[in-house]
């Protein structure tokens, strides 16, 4: 009995935990993986749009400025070459000479004319004439290519600005995961919440267990991924995330934690990655938020503090208590041992039912016998007519 009480005591002595594991996914959702020795870098250029969107902001802005500046310089140089080849620069003071571009007297003027042409801000005293067919062709090319550059760069900037990454920053996960009893079964639980009043549509949750394993053939897999069921079969993984929800993984026979006791779990080396996905209500774009829990961040024998209260006509969420937990009596044995103990208890109760029924029947039989004796006494005392008198009548 003392051992059972110690097993359920939340304040029992905890074994030392393993520390120092390198995270696969950071708490803020960043994947702690760097791509090294990539030889086929040309593949990034085959999808230039995605490459530009994935760049850091300072690099994206630098590329944005360079794209426009280089096109202006390129076409400005061509305008200058046309003027130089036609001899327009040698007849600047000749009023009878018809240049390709009026008042284009040097490279700077050609550069400014290129900017005016590509940005369509309107011509000033520099304007193309109809005596320059090569200039007309170049004007058409610059107008078309300038529109393509505008569409490409503005599209990149728009997609980069409207990316739902910042929306994922308002989706929060509890700082710890907990293990405790729920409906008589051991469950691994964590909490998710949405700080915004605009909701995530079609929200779903997934969980992955990441740890190293070795196959029967001796192959070592350093980051083996195993799915943790969070209600896929029952539909509980589809969330209506209006208020914070506690996500539960029942530790059953299909769970990788089925044979893990408290001591074994705390000595294990693993990482639990949780992934929340959904569509942003305002934009319709898919959003994904991630977090992870190491062994040190899994609290055995704890439960989350309630954050939802009913006020006058509405529910209020107190996010100050979002990460808080409290200790509850929880067995230190594994879920398998707990299930076996419950099965033995159920079997004992099952086989004890017939014996209890037999005892009840015997008690009822003894009571009926005592009642019959009292009736006989009453008959003899004259409370009931004797059978002989009835026969005589």
Curated annotation (Swiss-Prot):
Protein name listed in UniProt: G protein-activated inward rectifier potassium channel 3
Motif (Selectivity filter): 120-125
Pfam families according to UniProt: IRK (PF01007), IRK_C (PF17655)
Mutagenesis / variant outcome for changing residue 393 to I: Abolishes interaction with SNX27
Complexes and interactors: Associates with KCNJ3/GIRK1 to form a G-protein-activated heteromultimer pore-forming unit. Interacts (via PDZ-binding motif) with SNX27 (via PDZ domain); the interaction is required when endocytosed to prevent degradation in lysosomes and promote recycling to the plasma membrane.
Intramembrane residue numbers: 107-118, 119-125
Keywords, alphabetical: Ion channel, Ion transport, Membrane, Potassium, Potassium transport, Transmembrane, Transmembrane helix, Transport, Voltage-gated channel
Subcellular location per the Swiss-Prot or TrEMBL entry: Membrane
Species in which this protein is naturally found: Rattus norvegicus (Rat)
Comp. bias intervals (Pro residues): 384-393
Motif range (PDZ-binding): 390-393
Side Extracellular, residues: 83-106, 126-134
GO cellular component terms, semicolon-separated: monoatomic ion channel complex; parallel fiber to Purkinje cell synapse; plasma membrane; presynaptic membrane
Function: This receptor is controlled by G proteins. Inward rectifier potassium channels are characterized by a greater tendency to allow potassium to flow into the cell rather than out of it. Their voltage dependence is regulated by the concentration of extracellular potassium; as external potassium is raised, the voltage range of the channel opening shifts to more positive voltages. The inward rectification is mainly due to the blockage of outward current by internal magnesium. Unable to produce channel activity when expressed alone but forms a functional channel in association with KCNJ3/GIRK1.
GO-annotated biological processes: potassium ion import across plasma membrane; regulation of monoatomic ion transmembrane transport; regulation of presynaptic membrane potential
Primary localization: membrane
Similarity remark: Belongs to the inward rectifier-type potassium channel (TC 1.A.2.1) family. KCNJ9 subfamily.
Domain comment, as recorded: The PDZ-binding motif specifically binds the PDZ domain of SNX27: the specificity for SNX27 is provided by the 2 residues located upstream (Glu-388 and Ser-389) of the PDZ-binding motif.
């Amino acid at each position: 009995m003392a051992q059972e009480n110690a097993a359920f005591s939340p304040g029992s002595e905890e074994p030392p935990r393993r520390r120092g594991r390198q995270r696969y996914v950071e708490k803020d959702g960043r994947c702690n993986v760097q791509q090294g020795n990539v030889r086929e870098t040309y593949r990034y250029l085959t999808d230039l749009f995605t490459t530009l969107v994935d760049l850091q902001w300072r690099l994206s802005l630098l590329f944005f400025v360079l794209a426009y500046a280089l096109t202006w310089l390129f076409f400005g140089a061509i305008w200058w070459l046309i003027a130089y080849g036609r001899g327009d620069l040698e007849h600047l003071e000749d009023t009878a000479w018809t240049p390709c571009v009026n008042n284009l007297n040097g490279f700077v003027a050609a550069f400014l004319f290129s900017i005016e042409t590509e940005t369509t801000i309107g011509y000033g005293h520099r304007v193309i004439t109809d005596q320059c067919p090569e200039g007309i062709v170049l004007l058409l090319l610059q107008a078309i290519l300038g529109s393509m550059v505008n569409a490409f760069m503005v599209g990149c900037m728009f997609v980069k600005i409207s990316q739902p990454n910042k929306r994922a920053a308002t989706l929060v996960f509890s700082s710890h995961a907990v293990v405790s009893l729920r409906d008589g079964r051991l469950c691994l639980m964590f909490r998710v919440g949405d700080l915004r009043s605009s909701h995530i549509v079609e929200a779903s949750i997934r969980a992955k267990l990441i740890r190293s394993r070795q196959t029967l053939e001796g192959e070592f897999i350093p980051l083996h991924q195993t799915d943790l069921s969070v209600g896929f079969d029952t539909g509980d993984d589809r969330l209506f995330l209006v208020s914070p929800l506690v996500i539960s993984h029942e530790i059953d026979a299909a769970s990788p934690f089925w044979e893990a006791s408290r001591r074994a779990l705390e000595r294990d080396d693993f990482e639990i990655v949780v992934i929340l996905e959904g569509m942003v209500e305002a934009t319709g774009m898919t959003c994904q938020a991630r977090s992870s829990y190491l062994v040190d961040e899994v609290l055995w024998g704890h439960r989350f503090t309630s954050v939802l209260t009913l006020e006058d006509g509405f529910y209020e969420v107190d996010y100050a208590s979002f990460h808080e937990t409290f200790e509850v009596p929880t067995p230190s044995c594994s879920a398998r041992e707990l299930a076996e103990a419950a099965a033995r208890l159920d079997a004992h109760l099952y086989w004890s039912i017939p014996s209890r029924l037999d005892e009840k029947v015997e008690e009822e039989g003894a009571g009926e016998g005592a009642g019959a004796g009292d009736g006989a006494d009453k008959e003899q005392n004259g409370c009931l007519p004797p059978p002989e008198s009835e026969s005589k009548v």
